[in-house]
């Protein structure tokens, strides 16, 4: 059987060669009488008929160039022809496409004169790049980790050195590690390498919080800061370029300078940390001492006999002596000896203004933290059925108490009050957090154990509107007597509770069940009960009259028409399953978050040091909110400039933008277009944007981009710029560790080859942004490098390094080019985008 097949293949190949030879001999004999046929379509290739051409097109080989760069084995499998016939076809395609031939250097130079160049908006930067961003090339841009995205010096951070939790200002942290003698000058500031420091980082897409390494701590001086005050009393003091995670129709990173009152800044509901062991009785005693203890004499004063008995008993067990108890006017003062002072440490000499949360409590588990807070509440807290209030004169202690509450998943409110010249910090807990606080009340010795439920919800109206927009895609039963239904279907500007969110979650689960039932009915050939209007399938080519008929009478009888209707309904079911799953994922994510409304935003004079932690893996750390470094200003400017006519530095073309980190901002495009003399609405219409959610999706979008490029090729606005921002984000997130490096680089090489092919075949400019990572062995010079390794380094035609310069300027350095010398250019970011 195998021999028979082999003979058949040989006969088939021989026939194909004979057919090709006949064509060649005929064309040879007729050369003098007939002009040589020009190959412009697949059917013009020798041995390619309509059926073979259709197979090739279905597989994506729809141009002469695509055939020319294919392998014989690929065509053999796709078209069902022999390898020899495939080779003949490829050779003909290469001759027609002029691929695989050599030319003299002077001819090649003439060909390069056809390369287009897009102005960056800056003459200095254009000169550095040899006239602008070139077509038929990949230009890579990456930036430093400082870039003006930092925190004010008094910003509190928490981190772990090995396994020990530290809680201090970012300035104190910097000086602690700089004192080890490893500070290095970097650009306009300084950087200190970190070896054993870990922080917790947040993935906005999944809601996952994980422990990760910090590589450097960096500082520089700035003149201005943004002060963002939140409705719960929190104050963020950060540089204007610093991205802040907000909820705007979904999670987005927005520069601090673009935050407005009413925006919702997103934080983490429960802050994680490594936990050490501490006895609950010790934690409770420390809470009492921080609340009511004094240093001179070293003692605790209380009016509660129960608390007095606990303190005496604890000291007897812990320190081996019975403390002296003085009774004055109904108050008990318990006096401690030197042995107690020794283990209390600095707390034994502190006063009301200098007290802090002890380090052993910062490192404790949730149960011990609850015991400490219970001790503090019993000592100096205020509690009713509807509110919890903790007051202190110490700013450090207030910050520490907030941190401990966040460890338990409680987000308190903060306010300040000045009494007789002294500032007091008031921390209070209301709303749904009161229920969570009951885990503290369980440890209390003198306070009641239950609080009222309900109150103001923790979920904002913006979340309800976002979910309501998704819910409007369905047609489900009305529920006018339910709050959840009103949140989704009416414009109600109210915060809602966990109970309401859970009911909304049930609606979307019901939608998924009904979609599944409809799918099963269609597969059985029955008329389905749809959880969406029948009119939804008009988008698939059906008329309103047809849809009305199907809704009334059921699926059509004619098999071919029935198949089309079923196919359209299944497509709509699949789409709506994605909508319902997005809603459920959003709900699950919202449960891990806190939403803080912005009360005010003010730009203030600062003229001091700002600091930043460098987290190479994820570019953000928890408390304060995240940090993600982007190099998108130049990309936005190019997306506008490419649309200008050639005499004004453009190519009169359209743009494709693949967005991997949700950084494309149409508002910025409109601003640049207006200031460059272009119609902002028309400018937006010429930009095609797609969000990539993983590396496979990113690579698929490059294939889809080719379809748009072909479609627009003969129009008055052909695609001339393809932006990928950023190139490596998904590859880094999905391929973690050395064990996956080879697979990642192989996949990246394929991705870059596809981008190069688009640039060459269609004469477009490919512009990619990249991230940086720390070089752990760098003690001098630039302590960062772009990610992507040698694969990206050798694939990018030009590589440009961006850094922050003086007086708000930016510096671009050309570090790799096949034909241009290294050099630098200085430019600014303004309303026009990039300019001199």
UniProtKB/Swiss-Prot annotation:
Region (Disordered): 15-41
InterPro entries: DNA_recomb/repair_Rad51_C (IPR013632), DNA_recomb/repair_RadA (IPR011938), DNA_repair_Rad51/TF_NusA_a-hlx (IPR010995), Hint_dom_C (IPR003586), Hint_dom_N (IPR003587), Hint_dom_sf (IPR036844), Hlx-hairpin-Hlx_DNA-bd_motif (IPR003583), Homing_endonucl (IPR027434)
Biased composition (Acidic residues): 15-24
UniProt keyword terms in alphabetical order: ATP-binding, Autocatalytic cleavage, DNA damage, DNA recombination, DNA-binding, Endonuclease, Hydrolase, Intron homing, Nuclease, Nucleotide-binding, Protein splicing
Superkingdom classification of source: Archaea
Gene Ontology biological process terms, A to Z: DNA repair; intein-mediated protein splicing; intron homing
HAMAP family: RadA_arch
Cross-referenced PANTHER family: MEIOTIC RECOMBINATION PROTEIN DMC1_LIM15 HOMOLOG, RECA/RAD51/RADA DNA STRAND-PAIRING FAMILY MEMBER
Further information: The intein interrupts the ATP-binding site.
Protein name: DNA repair and recombination protein RadA
Organism of derivation: Thermococcus kodakarensis (strain ATCC BAA-918 / JCM 12380 / KOD1) (Pyrococcus kodakaraensis (strain KOD1))
Upper taxonomic lineage: Archaea, Methanobacteriati, Methanobacteriota, Thermococci, Thermococcales
């Amino acid at each position: 059987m195998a021999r028979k097949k082999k003979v058949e293949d040989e006969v088939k190949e021989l026939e194909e060669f004979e057919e090709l030879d006949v064509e060649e001999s005929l064309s040879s004999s007729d050369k003098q009488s007939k002009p040589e046929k020009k190959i412009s379509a697949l059917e013009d290739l020798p041995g390619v008929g309509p059926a073979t051409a259709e197979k090739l097109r279905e597989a994506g080989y729809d141009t002469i160039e695509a055939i020319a760069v294919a392998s014989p084995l690929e065509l053999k499998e796709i078209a069902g022809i022999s390898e020899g016939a495939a080779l003949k076809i490829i050779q003909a395609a290469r001759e027609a496409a002029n691929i695989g031939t050599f030319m003299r250097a002077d001819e090649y130079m003439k060909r390069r004169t056809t390369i287009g160049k897009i102005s960056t908006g800056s003459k200095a930067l254009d000169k550095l790049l040899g006239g602008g961003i070139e077509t038929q090339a990949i230009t890579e841009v990456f930036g430093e980790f400082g870039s003006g995205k930092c925190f004010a010096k008094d910003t509190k951070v928490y981190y772990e050195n090995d396994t020990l939790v530290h809680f201090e200002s970012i300035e104190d942290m910097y000086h602690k590690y700089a004192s080890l003698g490893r500070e290095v000058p970097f650009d306009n500031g300084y950087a200190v390498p970190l070896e054993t420091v870990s922080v917790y980082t947040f993935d906005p897409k999944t809601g996952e919080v994980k422990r990760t390494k910090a590589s450097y701590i960096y500082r520089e001086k700035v003149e201005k800061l943004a002060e963002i005050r939140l409705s719960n009393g929190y104050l963020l003091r950060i540089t204007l370029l610093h991205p802040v995670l907000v909820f705007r129709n979904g999670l987005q990173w927005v520069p601090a300078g673009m935050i407005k009152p009413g925006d919702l800044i997103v934080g983490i509901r429960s802050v994680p940390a490594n936990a050490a062991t501490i006895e609950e009785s010790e934690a409770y005693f420390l809470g009492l001492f921080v609340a009511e203890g004094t240093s001179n004499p070293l003692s605790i004063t209380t009016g509660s006999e129960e608390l007095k008995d606990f303190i005496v008993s604890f000291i007897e067990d812990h320190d081996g002596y019975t403390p002296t108890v003085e009774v004055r006017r109904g108050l008990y003062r318990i006096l401690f000896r030197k042995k107690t002072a020794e283990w209390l440490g600095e707390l034994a000499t502190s006063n009301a203004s200098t007290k802090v949360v002890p380090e052993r409590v910062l490192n404790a588990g949730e149960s011990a933290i609850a015991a400490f807070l219970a001790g503090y509440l019993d000592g100096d807290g205020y509690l009713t059925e509807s509110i919890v209030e903790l007051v202190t004169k110490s700013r450090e202690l207030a910050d520490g108490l907030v941190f401990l509450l966040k460890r338990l998943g409680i987000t308190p409110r903060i306010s300040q009050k000045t009494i007789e010249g002294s500032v007091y910090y008031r921390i209070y807990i209301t709303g749904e957090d009161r229920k969570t606080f009951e885990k503290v009340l369980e440890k209390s010795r003198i306070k009641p154990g239950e609080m009222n439920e309900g109150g103001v919800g923790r979920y904002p109206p913006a979340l309800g509107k976002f979910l309501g927009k998704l819910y409007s895609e369905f047609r489900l039963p009305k529920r006018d007597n339910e709050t959840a239904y009103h949140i989704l279907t009416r414009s109600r500007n109210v915060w809602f509770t966990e109970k309401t969110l859970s009911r909304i979650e049930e609606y979307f689960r019901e939608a998924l069940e009904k979609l599944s039932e409809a799918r099963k009915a269609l597969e059985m050939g029955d008329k389905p009960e749809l959880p969406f209007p029948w009119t939804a399938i008009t988008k698939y080519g059906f008329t309103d009259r047809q849809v009305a008929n199907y809704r009334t009478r059921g699926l059509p009888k004619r098999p071919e028409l029935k198949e089309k209707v079923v196919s359209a309904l299944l497509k709509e079911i699949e789409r709506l399953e994605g909508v319902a799953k997005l809603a459920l994922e959003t709900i699950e994510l919202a449960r891990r978050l806190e939403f803080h409304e912005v009360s005010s935003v003010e730009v203030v004079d600062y003229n001091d040091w700002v600091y930043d932690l460098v987290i190479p893996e994820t570019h953000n750390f928890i408390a304060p909110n995240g940090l993600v470094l982007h190099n998108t200003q130049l990309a936005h400017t190019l997306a506008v400039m490419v649309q200008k006519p050639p005499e004004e530095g453009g190519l009169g073309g359209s743009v494709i933008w693949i967005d991997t980190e949700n950084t494309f901002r149409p508002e910025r495009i409109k601003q640049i277009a207006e200031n460059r003399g272009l119609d902002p609405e028309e400018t937006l219409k010429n930009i095609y944007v797609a969000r990539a959610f993983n590396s496979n999706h990113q690579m698929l979008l490059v294939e889809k981009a080719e379809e748009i490029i072909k479609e627009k090729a003969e129009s008055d606005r052909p695609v001339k710029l393809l932006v990928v921002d950023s190139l490596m984000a998904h590859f880094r997130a999905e391929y973690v560790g050395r064990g996956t490096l080879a697979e990642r680089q192989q996949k990246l090489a394929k991705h870059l080859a596809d981008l190069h092919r688009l640039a060459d075949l269609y004469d477009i400019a490919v512009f990619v942004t990249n991230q940086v990572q720390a070089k752990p062995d760098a003690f001098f010079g630039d302590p960062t490098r772009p990610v992507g390794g040698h694969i990206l380094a050798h694939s990018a035609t030009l590589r440009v390094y961006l850094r922050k310069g003086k007086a708000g300027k930016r510096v671009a350095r050309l570090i790799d080019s096949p034909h241009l010398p290294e050099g630098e250019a200085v430019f600014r970011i303004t309303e026009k985008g990039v300019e001199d």
